[in-house]
């Protein structure tokens, strides 16, 4: 628990900054970067989850003063790829990927308050996961349009919010967010053994109209719908 519960290390090979001449600065990150998520799970086992983030053609335009900054971002492709997870010293294959297409939006930070608004034209995902009992699940799907927005008020003087969440909430930490997902379609296949040790398999598909969800977190409590 506490500060050692989880960590995220990000390796960015290159960041290019350019002055646009109108008080704005353009930032372009490397087309590919790596992430390494690690920590301790609820069972007390250490885990490590490496990932690759591909974002070719990305750009971010920043404007304003340091104490009141607005960032406008554009990510033509944003793809997260997982290959494996290590938990309790045991490595397991975890081939998963998630891709957002044509993502644009803004992020604004001023006086300890942060708000963001992001829209994506499409979300795709696929995976092929086999557990320790050799039961396998393959899935793939997509969603048309994805929109997220939210705000966060951050109290001064709280560096590690995970370790000191209670104190942060008492000092004014508050978050809210909404997500809207358009029409969604997915397919899946599974195979394995039944309770008698016999081979079993199946397949299915899902088609939905989409959904909306929202959440809040503040000293008064947590809510979602």
Segments and roles (model prediction):
Residues 1-225:
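Glycine-rich, small/hydroxylated-residue low-complexity segments
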């Amino acid at each position: 628990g506490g500060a050692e519960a989880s960590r995220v290390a990000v390796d960015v090979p290159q960041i290019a900054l350019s002055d646009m001449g109108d008080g704005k600065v353009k930032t372009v990150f490397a087309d590919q970067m790596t992430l390494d998520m690690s920590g301790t799970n609820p069972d007390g086992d250490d885990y490590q989850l490496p990932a690759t983030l591909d974002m070719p053609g990305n750009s971010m335009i920043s404007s304003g003063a340091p104490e009141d900054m607005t960032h406008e971002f554009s990510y033509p492709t944003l793809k997260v790829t997982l290959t494996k997870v290590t938990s309790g010293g045991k490595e397991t294959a975890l081939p998963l990927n998630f891709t957002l297409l044509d993502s644009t939006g803004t992020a604004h930070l001023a006086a300890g308050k942060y708000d963001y608004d992001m829209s994506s034209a499409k979300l795709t995902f696929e995976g092929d996961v086999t557990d320790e009992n050799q039961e396998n699940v393959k899935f793939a799907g997509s969603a048309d349009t994805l929109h997220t927005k939210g705000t966060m008020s951050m109290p001064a003087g709280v560096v590690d919010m995970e370790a000191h969440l209670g104190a942060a909430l008492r000092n004014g930490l508050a978050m809210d967010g909404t997500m809207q997902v358009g029409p969604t379609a997915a397919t899946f296949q599974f195979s394995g053994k039944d309770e008698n040790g016999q081979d079993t398999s199946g397949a299915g598909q899902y088609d939905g109209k989409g959904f909306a969800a929202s959440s809040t977190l503040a000293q008064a409590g947590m809510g979602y719908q």
